[in-house]
């Protein structure tokens, strides 16, 4: 599974992308929830 020719391994790209998506979605929901709570 070490057949990358100087490129970034796909599993690292997938892991970083997945964590980025989780962080963005989490921040989005947290911002929406905090905005909803403060507007009430």
Swiss-Prot record:
Q: Where are the transmembrane segments?
A: 12-26
Topological type in the membrane: Single-pass membrane protein
What does a knockout show? No change in growth rate or oxygen evolution under standard growth conditions (50 umol photons/m(2)/s and 45 degrees Celsius). Dimeric PSII less stable upon isolation, accumulates a PSII assembly intermediate (PSII-I) in which assembly factors Psb27, Psb28 and Psb34 associate with PSII; the complex is lacking PsbY, the CaMn(4)O(5) cluster, and O(2)-evolving complex subunits PsbO, PsbU and PsbV. Only the D1 protein translated from the psbA2 or psbA3 gene is found in PSII.
Any note on cofactor binding? PSII binds multiple chlorophylls, carotenoids and specific lipids.
Q: Which domain of life is it from?
A: Bacteria
Give residue numbers for the modification (N-acetylmethionine): 2
Q: Which InterPro entries match?
A: PSII_PsbJ (IPR002682), PSII_PsbJ_sf (IPR037267)
Q: Which GO terms describe its biological process?
A: photosynthesis
Any GO CC annotation of this UniProt entry: plasma membrane-derived thylakoid membrane
The subcellular localization recorded is:
Cellular thylakoid membrane
Extract the NCBIfam families matched here: PRK02565.1 (NF002722)
What the entry lists under HAMAP family is as follows: PSII_PsbJ (MF_01305)
* Subunit annotation: PSII is composed of 1 copy each of membrane proteins PsbA, PsbB, PsbC, PsbD, PsbE, PsbF, PsbH, PsbI, PsbJ, PsbK, PsbL, PsbM, PsbT, PsbX, PsbY, PsbZ, Psb30/Ycf12, peripheral proteins PsbO, CyanoQ (PsbQ), PsbU, PsbV and a large number of cofactors. It forms dimeric complexes.
The entry's function note states: One of the components of the core complex of photosystem II (PSII). PSII is a light-driven water:plastoquinone oxidoreductase that uses light energy to abstract electrons from H(2)O, generating O(2) and a proton gradient subsequently used for ATP formation. It consists of a core antenna complex that captures photons, and an electron transfer chain that converts photonic excitation into a charge separation.
The family assignment reads:
Belongs to the PsbJ family.
Q: What is this protein called?
A: Photosystem II reaction center protein J
Species, as recorded: Thermosynechococcus vestitus (strain NIES-2133 / IAM M-273 / BP-1)
Organism lineage: Bacteria, Bacillati, Cyanobacteriota, Cyanophyceae, Acaryochloridales
Supply the gene name.
psbJ
């Amino acid at each position: 599974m070490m057949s990358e020719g100087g490129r970034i391994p796909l599993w690292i790209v997938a892991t970083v992308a997945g964590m980025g998506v989780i962080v963005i979605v989490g921040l989005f929901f947290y911002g929406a929830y905090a905005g909803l709570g403060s507007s009430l």
